[in-house]
Amino acid sequence: MSKQTYKVCFCFRRRYRHTVSVAPAEIKTLFDNYSDKGLMTTDLLLRFLIDVQKQDKATKEEAQDIVNASSSLLHRNGLHLDAFFKYLFAVTNSPLSSLEVHQDMDAPLSHYFIYTGHNSYLTGNQLSSDCSELPIIEALKKGVRVIELDIWPNSDEDGIDVLHGRTLTSPVELIKCLRAIREHAFDVSDYPVVVTLEDHLTPKLQAKVAEMVTDIFGEMLFTPPSGECLKEFPSPAFLKKRIMISTKPPKEYKAATDDDLVKKGRDLGDKEVWGREVPSFIRRDRSVDKNDSNGDDDDDDDDDDDDDDGDDKIKKNAPPEYKHLIAIEAGKPKGGITECLKVDPDKVRRLSLSEEQLEKASEKYAKQIVRFTQRNLLRVYPKGTRITSSNYNPLIAWSHGAQMVAFNMQGLGRSLWVMQGMFRGNGGCGYIKKPDLLLKSNAVFDPEATLPVKTTLRVTIYMGEGWYYDFPHTHFDRYSPPDFYTRVGIAGVPADTVMKKTKTLEDNWIPAWDEVFEFPLTVPELALLRIEVHEYDMSEKDDFGGQICLPVWELRQGIRAVPLRNQDGVKCRSVKLLVRLEFV
């Protein structure tokens, strides 16, 4: 037991004792129930794994492995209380049911949510940051499977740059981005990478792109049979280790001054280090859209406009080699949203809508959007006024079946944490099989419908530890140990979305909250468990202490060790919570 000294005023000091982790009362009770004379034998541990941890297929060999890993060489016949507590709080006691790919990967691409980036080359904001291949590499190393490149003629108009057009962003050469994709596409996942090209090139430069892409990607490149359109998308399993090109025609850009964009986007950035709470994680409010739309269905983010007028032009003027690259065709038919959502039985395609366009369309056409996404791909992207690279609530798009919910991966905050949480599922491969409710053709899911509760998730937050080892002792408070509290809740369909909070425990590096929360879920297939730890500060904003977001459908029941992550989504070295997860 060590002591810490904190300054008080100018000439006084206070000392606090730092205690060690001890098993919570409920853990001690469980140990007593599954032990004999202070020893949990392998047979009794196996009973515990089946009864409490709900590991129905657990074996005696697995129980013995736990004993071996948690005990000293002199006590391999079972677990004492300290060793039992050590096993429960070990990072190997994961809250996720599987850390490997375990879903069916043989369905068409349209049956999966796909980890998707927006303006993947930007290092910061949308207006003046540098363009580089480094954010692309970083995204691929995090499992992102869709990379977006805006391609423009360079200043001499004889080469191709990647940059955010009509802004002050500095360019990066296309060839650097393509080489980065080739080198890192399959660092963490063998499943396909889609490169979406926002094309602003002449036919001559398009021919150069075709040559570059073909030379650099080589046999990795997947192209459909010459002259044919895909009638159905191939599966992720079929496309393993392949790269696909998805593109749409050159576009006319609306004129907008930098000052206009700054004025519109100034209040959209996250104001706190962990990001302000996303309003639609609390409630879904459509009144803003209705009041501000003025009957105009256009979106301000012009660099994502799918217009089939341009599509006809590119097919007429583009060199054959360039057209042959396109594995996933993009297009937005004339005639408004009803035409956009028509399903062609002989052809599949990709449609892009901004977050605002999707919200407007979903007011009247929610079921049609879901039906469209059963065969076709829907990409949703941030509205153009998000110049700080902030993000939006992805659940609205996912609940309508949108596969490519495009995010600014540099836009830290709660929205990105939810995105990262979703794609921790299925082994982190970047593809999550959509739930059956979004794929039924005979009973199309209505995201706006009020549904009965399917199950209730009960979460017990026992305690946390690790901050003492990861942070200086005055990191959270100069005058005393930290005052931690935990926020726990659900991101999901509107009926399921909620956030709750534990009490604040003062002056404690190892807080033991021991509080229980229950979350009724109407659509557990689309729910994510959110946990955040903060340190209460009376005079300033609360300090960030860690966060995690996990897909509910992949949770393991029982008592689990939950490692927390920092604002970037990187796992903390030591910080973790002890929780119990139950479906009741």
UniProtKB/Swiss-Prot annotation:
Cross-referenced PANTHER family: PHOSPHOINOSITIDE PHOSPHOLIPASE C 7, PHOSPHOINOSITIDE-SPECIFIC PHOSPHOLIPASE C FAMILY PROTEIN
Naturally occurring in which organism (per UniProt): Arabidopsis thaliana (Mouse-ear cress)
Keyword Transmembrane helix carried by entry: no
Top-level taxon of origin: Eukaryota
EC number, as in UniProt: 3.1.4.11
Catalytic residues identified in the record: 118, 164
Biological role: The production of the second messenger molecules diacylglycerol (DAG) and inositol 1,4,5-trisphosphate (IP3) is mediated by activated phosphatidylinositol-specific phospholipase C enzymes.
Annotated InterPro entries: C2_dom, C2_domain_sf, EF-hand-dom_pair, PI-PLC_fam, PLC-like_Pdiesterase_TIM-brl, PLC_EF-hand-like, PLipase_C_PInositol-sp_X_dom, PLipase_C_Pinositol-sp_Y
Keywords: Cell membrane, Hydrolase, Lipid degradation, Lipid metabolism, Membrane, Phosphoprotein, Transducer
Chain positions covered by the region annotation Disordered: 285-318
Protein's recorded name: Phosphoinositide phospholipase C 7
PTM-bearing positions, type Phosphoserine: 287
Keyword Repeat in record: no
Annotated Acidic residues bias: 294-311
Primary localization: membrane
